[in-house]
């Protein structure tokens, strides 16, 4: 849930430990993320944003910050009959300014136990809310292979094509068939390896900030 009060932000940080990651609720994707390392920094962050809003307090998402983590996703599907499948894993760890630049499927260098854990968590999430259709579960995986849940995207994302390449299925068609009341197609074993590289418009003269081109 979004958090508004400074006391709640501090309590969370004391419970889970610094550093923590702050993000305003009105920032899409990875935009607006700030890493906070201690109580003094949290108070400065909070007061600066409060002042900029003229006393109209923002709401924030706060999470434990995982240093040097990998951003790993599962492309999942579930039909109205309760059948579930993971079409592929994806690694989206290559980013700039918290925006994805390279997507890779299947996610490399993951041991079977971590893959099984990701699939178990994803299945549980979809079953819990009786999710029907295709979606993406996103996780952070630490260097010690500890898994943290990030979010569910209840849609196909632009990087779904790398999953299509390795599972051999048309995922847009899958989504339509499931919405029409059909059964999902169980995902076959991954074949080969696939990359998607995003072309972005950035200005090298200003530290690669986004540019209109």
Regions found by a protein language model. Give the residues of each.
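ATP-dependent carboxylate activation and anion-phosphoryl transfer catalytic cores
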Residues: 19, 24, 29, 37-213
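A conserved helix-loop-beta module that forms one wall/lid of the active-site cleft
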Residues: 1-32
């Amino acid at each position: 849930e979004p958090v508004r009060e400074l006391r709640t932000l501090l309590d969370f940080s004391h419970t889970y430990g610094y550093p923590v990651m702050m993000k305003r609720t009105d920032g899409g994707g990875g935009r607006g993320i700030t890493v906070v390392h201690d109580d003094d920094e949290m108070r400065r962050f909070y007061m600066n944003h409060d002042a900029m809003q003229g006393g109209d307090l923002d709401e924030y998402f706060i999470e434990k910050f995982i240093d040097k983590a990998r951003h790993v996703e599962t492309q999942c599907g579930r039909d109205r009959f309760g059948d579930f499948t993971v079409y592929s894993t994806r690694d989206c760890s290559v980013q700039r300014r918290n925006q994805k630049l390279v997507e890779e499927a299947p996610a490399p260098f993951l041991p079977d136990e971590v893959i099984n854990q990701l699939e178990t968590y994803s299945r549980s999430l979809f079953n819990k809310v009786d999710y029907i259709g295709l979606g993406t579960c996103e996780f952070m995986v630490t260097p010690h292979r500890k898994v943290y849940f990030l979010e569910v995207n209840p849609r196909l994302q632009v990087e779904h094509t790398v999953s299509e390449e390795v599972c051999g299925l048309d995922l847009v068609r899958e989504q339509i068939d499931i919405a029409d009341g059909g059964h999902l197609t169980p995902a076959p074993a991954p074949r080969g390896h696939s990359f998607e590289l995003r072309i972005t418009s950035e200005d090298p003269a200003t530290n690669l900030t986004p540019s209109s081109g």
